[in-house]
Design a protein with these regions (language model features):
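DNA-recognition alpha helix
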Residues: 64-75
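Interdomain motor-coupling "hinge/lid" segment immediately C-terminal to the ATP-binding subdomain
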Residues: 1-60
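Hydrophobic (often cysteine-bearing) scaffold residues that line and stabilize catalytic clefts
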Residues: 18, 22, 42, 80, ...
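A cross-kingdom feature that marks ATP-driven nucleic-acid transaction machinery
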Residues: 83-90, 95-253
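Short coil/turn segments at secondary-structure boundaries
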Residues: 13, 41, 63-66, 100-102
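Short, locally clustered residues in the helix-turn-helix/winged-helix DNA-binding domain
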Residues: 51-55, 71, 149
């Protein structure tokens, strides 16, 4: 998850040389191409946005909130939500990031708010942050996303709306999240990425949204360790990230 999967990186020996290659690639190829193609004047602000996206993999992205941050913290009034949207579009066109739209599973419709963005190559993402932010849970989530895209699936972020009773006896609407809703033809999988499941409480927390989905498609929790495939009484599958990446047929087991 540290060096990514760009072809040339495999032939470079030594962590320092790999890091230097990725940093140079980011600046001399990706940034240079984007600046030339789109004639960006606010280069420092653009690069700050790239760092924000790199540090928030797996988090919802709201252009309005980001623009307000630039305005309040950086004192920049010329970076609007439309500017942020345009900059993100440039990164998508450069194949640096990819958007996962938000999908209402029970309502069977897309929700046009707070998508998530994942980096096409994690080595490049890590180089952008000078290899200082390597949170395994976020990186693993990005790996799972990339793997399902590599297998040809359309990958969205899922919402499951439920009603729960409060301590005061009132009914309240709660939105639970499914990390990934993966579709390919008639096939669909619901995936949760959980780097660590230290106890039963955490396991039930990860399964909660999956348990609220009322269809028969496969529901899988992927954990950040080697693990033989398990299946609970509700049919929810648990498997390790190594097995998930190595044996593609396991998701159909």
């Amino acid at each position: 998850m540290g060096d990514g999967g760009l072809p040339k990186i495999l032939s470079i020996k030594g962590d320092d040389k790999k890091a230097a290659y990725l940093r140079n690639l980011y600046r001399t190829v990706y940034l240079s191409d984007i600046y030339e193609r789109y004639e960006i004047e606010n280069k420092a602000e653009f690069e700050e946005l790239v760092r924000i996206l790199a540090s928030s993999v797996g988090s919802p992205v709201n252009p309005t909130n980001l623009a307000n941050t630039f305005k309040s913290v950086k004192k920049l009034n010329n970076i609007t939500d439309k500017t942020i949207e345009a900059y993100i579009g440039y990164l998508e066109n450069a194949y640096m990031i990819e958007k996962a739209d938000r999908y209402d599973i029970k309502g069977r419709k897309y929700i046009g708010t707070t998508p998530k963005y994942y980096f096409k190559d994690l080595g490049l993402r890590n180089a952008i942050l000078s290899f200082r932010q390597t949170e395994e849970n976020h990186l693993m989530e990005n790996v799972v996303y990339n793997e399902m895209r590599y297998r040809g699936f359309l990958v969205d972020v899922g919402n499951v709306n439920i009603r729960v009773k409060t301590e005061e006896g009132k009914w309240q609407r709660v939105t639970l999240e499914v990390d990934f809703v993966c579709n390919l033809g008639s096939r669909r999988y619901y995936l949760q990425s959980a780097y660590r499941l230290p106890d039963e409480e955490k396991m039930q927390q990860e399964k909660r949204s999956l348990q609220q989905i009322g269809d028969s498609f496969k529901k899988i929790v992927i954990v950040g360790e080697r693990m033989k495939l398990r299946r609970d009484d509700n049919g929810i599958v648990q498997m390790g990230i190594y097995e998930f990446l190595t044996y593609s047929e396991l998701i159909d087991a």
